[in-house]
């Protein structure tokens, strides 16, 4: 199995970035009798929920861009005309008109449910990526963990958690095994398609969330 190595976006720098973003999901305890605003840094307003979500998505997108760069530099996968062959074997989440995330027919709650459900569906594909970047393992791991934090942020924002569909663990395990059993070319193409689709999904999500 080939591995990718990152130069422009080093693993150490990416991991340090993760440490800066993840604490937002787990704020430091506030002493009894004190309000969190009272212990905030002077002259700095604490980030709102929407600002944290926006920042988290942009951080993940930076990580995806770094991994995609390595994928594209390694081979011609980003230019391949045979993408459809591999893409037909995947069921990557995509935005559709019925999801209420586009400007036409925008519906905040319907869209939010779609975003969370889509991110949950992407998790098995992000797990697959952990075995595709041996020399950039920390970057791939950071994207995966940051996505989990993003899901937590969004679940707190959602009003109808019952409408969110959670993927079946057994089905995910079977899918992961199937993806890992592909030949080398298909594994490389799958990696490219996952990163590209995840980037597009997050970009669409970011535009929609900025309307909420």
From Swiss-Prot:
PROSITE patterns: INTERLEUKIN_6 (PS00254)
Disulfide bridge partners, by residue number: 72-78, 101-111
Glycosylation sites: 73
Induction section of the entry: Plasma levels are highly increased upon exercise, due to enhanced production by contracting skeletal muscles. Up-regulated by coagulation factor Xa (F10) in PAR-1 (F2R)-dependent manner in cardiac fibroblasts.
Protein name: Interleukin-6
Effect of residue 173 to V: Almost no loss of activity
Phosphoserine modification, residue list: 81
Keyword Phosphoprotein: yes
Pfam families xrefs: IL6 (PF00489)
Xref: Gene3D superfamilies: 1.20.1250.10
Assigned protein family: Belongs to the IL-6 superfamily.
One MF term in the entry's GO annotations: identical protein binding
GO biological process: acute-phase response; cell surface receptor signaling pathway via JAK-STAT; cell surface receptor signaling pathway via STAT; cellular response to hydrogen peroxide; cellular response to lipopolysaccharide; cellular response to virus; cytokine-mediated signaling pathway; defense response to Gram-negative bacterium
Role of this protein: Cytokine with a wide variety of biological functions in immunity, tissue regeneration, and metabolism. Binds to IL6R, then the complex associates to the signaling subunit IL6ST/gp130 to trigger the intracellular IL6-signaling pathway. The interaction with the membrane-bound IL6R and IL6ST stimulates 'classic signaling', whereas the binding of IL6 and soluble IL6R to IL6ST stimulates 'trans-signaling'. Alternatively, 'cluster signaling' occurs when membrane-bound IL6:IL6R complexes on transmitter cells activate IL6ST receptors on neighboring receiver cells. IL6 is a potent inducer of the acute phase response. Rapid production of IL6 contributes to host defense during infection and tissue injury, but excessive IL6 synthesis is involved in disease pathology. In the innate immune response, is synthesized by myeloid cells, such as macrophages and dendritic cells, upon recognition of pathogens through toll-like receptors (TLRs) at the site of infection or tissue injury. In the adaptive immune response, is required for the differentiation of B cells into immunoglobulin-secreting cells.
SMART domains noted in UniProt: IL6 (SM00126)
Effect upon mutating residue 212 to T/N/S/R: Loss of activity
Any GO CC annotation of this UniProt entry: interleukin-6 receptor complex
Residues annotated as signal peptide: 1-29
Disease: Rheumatoid arthritis systemic juvenile: An inflammatory articular disorder with systemic onset beginning before the age of 16. It represents a subgroup of juvenile arthritis associated with severe extraarticular features and occasionally fatal complications. During active phases of the disorder, patients display a typical daily spiking fever, an evanescent macular rash, lymphadenopathy, hepatosplenomegaly, serositis, myalgia and arthritis. A IL6 promoter polymorphism is associated with a lifetime risk of development of Kaposi sarcoma in HIV-infected men.
Keywords: Acute phase, Cytokine, Disulfide bond, Glycoprotein, Growth factor, Phosphoprotein, Secreted, Signal
Tissue distribution: Produced by skeletal muscle.
Post-translation changes: N- and O-glycosylated.
Locations listed in the record: Secreted
Domain of life according to the entry: Eukaryota
């Amino acid at each position: 199995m080939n591995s990718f190595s990152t130069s422009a976006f080093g693993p150490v720098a990416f991991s340090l970035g993760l440490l800066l973003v993840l604490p937002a999901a787990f704020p430091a305890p506030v002493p009894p009798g004190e309000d969190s605003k009272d212990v905030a840094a002077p002259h700095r307003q604490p980030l709102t929920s929407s600002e944290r979500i926006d920042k988290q998505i942009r951080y993940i997108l930076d990580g995806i861009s770094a991994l995609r760069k390595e994928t594209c530099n390694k081979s011609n996968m980003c230019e391949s005309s045979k993408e459809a062959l591999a893409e037909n074997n995947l069921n990557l989440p995509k935005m559709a008109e019925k999801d209420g995330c586009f400007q036409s027919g925008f519906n905040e709650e319907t869209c939010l449910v779609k975003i969370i459900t889509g991110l949950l569906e992407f998790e098995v594909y992000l797990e697959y990526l952990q075995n595709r970047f041996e020399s950039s393992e920390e970057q791939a791991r950071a994207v995966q963990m940051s996505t989990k934090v993003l899901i937590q942020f969004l679940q707190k924002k959602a009003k109808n958690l019952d409408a969110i569909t959670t993927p079946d663990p057994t089905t995910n395990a079977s899918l992961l095994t199937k993806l890992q059993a592909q030949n080398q070319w298909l594994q490389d193409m799958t990696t490219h398609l996952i990163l590209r689709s995840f980037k597009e999904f997050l970009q669409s999500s970011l535009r929609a969330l900025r309307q909420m």
